[in-house]
C-alpha cells in the first residue's frame, strides 16, 4: 500500500483503491485481485501483490486471468521490490506475456522514475500511458 499511496491514491477510499476486487473467471467465481485503482467507477490498473521472496515469474498467469476479464488497461505484478507493468499491446483485452516496464526499487533509474510518474493520480491518462507503453515495449 505504500507504493499505491506514493502514486497519490487514497488507499482508504474505495472509490480510488478497491481492495480484493472480484474478477469472476469463467466458472471460477469469487476470484479476487489484490487492488484495483479506480476512476469513474471503472478499474484502470489492477495490482497483484506477492511476498517479497516470491518469484514473480510464477504468478504472471494469475494477473493475466484477472486482466483478461476486466476493463482495466494496465496490470501491475509486484513483490514489493520488483514492479512489472503490463498492458494489452499485442491484442486488445488480452494481457501481453511480457511487461512493458519493470522496475527494481533497489536500483531505480531516472528514466524509470519518469515512467512511474505517469501512473501518479495527478498524471494518469489511460490513452497517453498506453502510447508510452507501446514506445517502451518496442524500444
Predicted regions and their residues:
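A short, conserved, highly charged catalytic patch centered on acidic carboxylates
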Residues: 1-74, 85-139
Amino acid at each position: 500500500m505504500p507504493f499505491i499511496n506514493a502514486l497519490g491514491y487514497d488507499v482508504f477510499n474505495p472509490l480510488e483503491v478497491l481492495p480484493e476486487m472480484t474478477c469472476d473467471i469463467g466458472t471460477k467465481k469469487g476470484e479476487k485481485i489484490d487492488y484495483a485503482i479506480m476512476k469513474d467507477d471503472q478499474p484502470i490498473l489492477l495490482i497483484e501483490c506477492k511476498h517479497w521472496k516470491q518469484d514473480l515469474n510464477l504468478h504472471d498467469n494469475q494477473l493475466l486471468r484477472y486482466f483478461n476479464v476486466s476493463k482495466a488497461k494496465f496490470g501491475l505484478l509486484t513483490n514489493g521490490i520488483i514492479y512489472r507493468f503490463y498492458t494489452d499491446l499485442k491484442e486488445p483485452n488480452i494481457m501481453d506475456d511480457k511487461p512493458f516496464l519493470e522496475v527494481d526499487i533497489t536500483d531505480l533509474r531516472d528514466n524509470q522514475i519518469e515512467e512511474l510518474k505517469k501512473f501518479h493520480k495527478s498524471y494518469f491518462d489511460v490513452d497517453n500511458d498506453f502510447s508510452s507503453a507501446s514506445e517502451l515495449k518496442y524500444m
